[in-house]
Amino acid sequence: MGHFTFISLCLMPIFLSLSGAECYTCPIDWLSRNGLCYKLFDDTKTWPDAEIFCRKHKPGCHLTSIHSEAESADLAEYIYDYLKSEKNVWIGLNDPQKERIWEWTDRSSTNYTSWNEGEPNNSWNKEYCVHLLASQGYLKWNDTPCESLFAFICRCQF
């Protein structure tokens, strides 16, 4: 009995620490990376409609934010592999106040950027939403009118 009690007491902290750990599983057709789930949607929407679509999946879902070169490369590969045609893809970066202050819809940090050369340029004073450029392998960003129709990628934590 003493041996069982000793082992039980030794293992108890392990079980208690695991009970607070969050387990996540992305739906089958979503990309899983670092505790987050990404899903590319091939149908085209305006930027606001794409953001609304993402939010309807689950509280906390948004058009994707991108925070590192590694995350950018993973997403570019995923998009390249699954998009049926060479379409630009909306991400969650925008300029909601139209003051050239870029914000992610999930309110995360904007310390990483990957603008295409010469961007953001706010051409014709109406480019307030951001997409991944198909012509740049989905690695570079461009500001464009929010009413443009593009494919889009959502990011969620399930």
Swiss-Prot record:
Disulfide bonds join C26-C37, C54-C154, C61-C156, C129-C146. Glycans are attached at N111, N121. Its main location: secreted. Keywords: Calcium, Disulfide bond, Glycoprotein, Lectin, Metal-binding, Secreted, Signal. Residues 33-155 form the C-type lectin domain. Homodimer; non-covalently linked. This is C-type lectin. It comes from Micrurus corallinus.
